[in-house]
Amino acid sequence: MEQRKVLECSGKNGLSISDLILVAILLAAGAVLKFFVGSMFSMGMKPNFIIAMYCLSILIIRPKFKDAAIIGLIAGAICQFFPGTPYINFISEFVGAIVMAALVRIPYGTGKRFSLIPIVSTFISTLASGFTFIGIMYMVFYSGADIKPVPLAIFMGIILGTAFINAVIVQILYVPLKLALKK
């Protein structure tokens, strides 16, 4: 008589279809915001709302680090469709997504109805992405590439302003979206 073994896999292996759809919709919304709303703030640079949307998606779906890294790389690829410094966003959005994935894993122990985790995590992740971007850009500039540097004070204003805007957007959207998705 033949004995059969049944193996069960516990834990999820990658993102579900609904998680992928959520990430796609939020990244698309971030691209639209970057294109239209970012134009209003244009001083040669545009705030990057794509960061807010990948932070929101990582906050809601809480992916593994490898999945968060892929979300960051996809966000970097989407940023390539917009004018600016090419290719740097691949690295900066990767770093921002990994930082966000790390921050959502910290056990904060808040049992309160209102949490500041979304606003704080998004602010820090946006800073990580922005500082990575400016660091790489200045390294490339000072290594002899033909890139015109924007004064550091302007970049700092853009990074801090974008971090603030992204943090507020994510804080406002987090609870309603989480409730709507029943997560």
Place the predicted regions along the sequence by residue.
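Membrane-helix interface "capping/anchor" motifs
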Residues: 58-71
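Membrane-embedded alpha-helical hairpins and interfacial helices in multi-pass inner-membrane proteins
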Residues: 87, 91, 111-183
